Curated annotation (Swiss-Prot):
The active site is at H9 (tele-phosphohistidine intermediate). The phosphoenolpyruvate-dependent sugar phosphotransferase system (sugar PTS), a major carbohydrate active -transport system, catalyzes the phosphorylation of incoming sugar substrates concomitantly with their translocation across the cell membrane. PANTHER family: PTS PERMEASE-RELATED-RELATED, PTS SYSTEM MANNOSE-SPECIFIC EIIAB COMPONENT-RELATED. It comes from Escherichia coli (strain K12). This is Putative phosphotransferase enzyme IIA component YadI.
Length: 146
């Protein structure tokens, strides 16, 4: 089963998790990380790293974030590069996350990414989709050769 780390501004992440658990019962491998004003990037990174390890069973983890480019999204992006089968999704809402509940058990992380972006477009995107639009910078020659 795919793990979920829901990370949003203020108390929104915990509110989403609480609403899901109220309706569906306790969710395994699902953690909420709230990003409050004044929280340092270092502390946010530590909290999200802990949540990643708690949610991961080896099948993959999906970071569900509220705003692309915001601190929770940026930290999730950095963490995803260090762990295989991690995806970063932005623009999520409670109804969309509810739609994806059953997919946690049947899809791979990349299949999940494609499906949630398809269902939530155009507001929902992923780190992978953003990277396809803006591929990383690659040097075509060695700068240090004389």
């Amino acid at each position: 089963m795919l793990g979920w780390v829901i990370t949003c501004h203020d108390d929104r992440a915990q509110e989403i998790l609480d609403a899901l658990e109220k309706k569906h019962g306790a969710l395994l491998q699902c953690r909420a990380v709230n990003f409050w004003r004044g929280l340092s990037s270092n502390m946010l990174s530590r909290m999200m790293c802990d949540a990643l390890h708690e949610a991961d069973s080896g099948e993959g983890v999906i970071f569900l974030t509220d705003i692309a480019g915001a601190p929770p999204y940026r930290v999730a992006s950095l963490l995803s590069h260090k762990h295989s089968r991690c995806e970063v999704i932005s623009g999520v809402t409670l109804p969309l996350i509810e739609q994806m509940m059953a997919c946690r058990e049947t899809m791979t992380s990349s299949e999940f990414r494609e499906r949630i972006v398809e269902l939530g477009a155009p507001e929902v995107s992923s780190l992978w989709h953003q990277q396809q639009k803006n591929p990383p910078f690659v040097l075509k020659h060695n700068l240090y050769e004389y």
